[in-house]
Regions:
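Conserved PLP-enzyme active-site core in the AAT-like
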Residues: 1-193, 197-201, 206, 211-217, ...
């Protein structure tokens, strides 16, 4: 298996990007057979694919006999942000993986979706690697509950992310912020004034947990357990972070 990474804007690629990266049919080159997209894109700050873009990529895949898979661990956020239906996205790909625990708040659970022959092959591969669980109905019930009850709550997570991003823009220790489309904020720390580790420590002192996301960036993710009444508190705690240049 050979993998070819494609640079995109905040992780989002286009049909032209796919075309430009299809290998020539030469004996000494790996054959291009699969296109994988991530929607929403984690390192792109939760960026979403537009439906028209997906349709164009799908068209290129069909014309070049390529399969299209979507890593949809956070697909629910994309559906809510863009107001698409699951069918809008599902019709554009051969397979898609989804997660029920990230945004939807189920305790555990992911699924892979495809046609009958694909799922049959996936089950065979899972078994070959020792995978499989018994009596998982109770976990499945939690996933169904999450879809039925928590899907529309994702919009609130998106609102919270935008609100805190606006707050962060006012901080002199923030150099830049990726565009906020869903429930994530990825911001770059101004290293002329402070460091990622110092900001993480100061946030932790105020019971705000964040993660380092590369050498200069920090990621914040908003989820089901962050309530509206917590946002003003979060803002005030961030306002308390004052960096004194040594």
């Amino acid at each position: 298996v050979s993998v070819k990474l494609v640079d995109g804007k905040n992780g989002i690629i286009t049909a032209n990007d796919v075309l430009a990266n299809i290998q020539a049919p030469l004996d000494w080159l790996p054959k291009t057979s699969l296109v994988c997209l991530e929607n929403t894109h984690n390192k792109g700050g939760g960026a979403c694919y537009e439906l028209d873009n997906l349709k164009e990529i799908r068209k290129v895949c069909i014309q070049n006999n390529l399969k299209l898979h979507i890593d949809g661990a956070r697909i629910w956020n994309a559906l809510v942000a863009k107001k698409y239906s699951p069918f809008d996205i599902g019709q554009q790909c051969d397979s898609i993986s989804v997660c029920f625990s990230k945004g939807l708040g189920a305790p555990v659970g992911s699924a892979i979706i495809g046609d009958f022959s694909f799922i049959k092959k996936a089950r065979r591969v899972r078994k070959a690697f020792g995978g499989g669980m018994r009596q998982v109905g109770i976990l499945g019930a939690a996933c169904i509950y999450a879809i039925d009850n928590n899907l529309q709550k994702l919009e609130l997570d998106h609102q919270h992310a935008n609100e805190i991003a606006n707050c962060l823009w006012e901080k002199d220790w923030v150099k830049s912020i990726l565009p906020v489309e869903t429930n994530m904020i990825i911001f770059e720390v101004d290293e002329q004034k402070t460091s990622v580790l110092q900001i993480l420590d100061l946030l932790k002192e105020k019971n705000i947990l964040a993660v380092q996301f590369g050498p200069k960036q920090i990621r914040l993710v908003f989820h089901l357990d962050i309530k509206p009444e917590m946002i003003p508190i979060l803002k005030s705690k961030m306002d308390e972070i004052i960096i004194s240049k040594q």
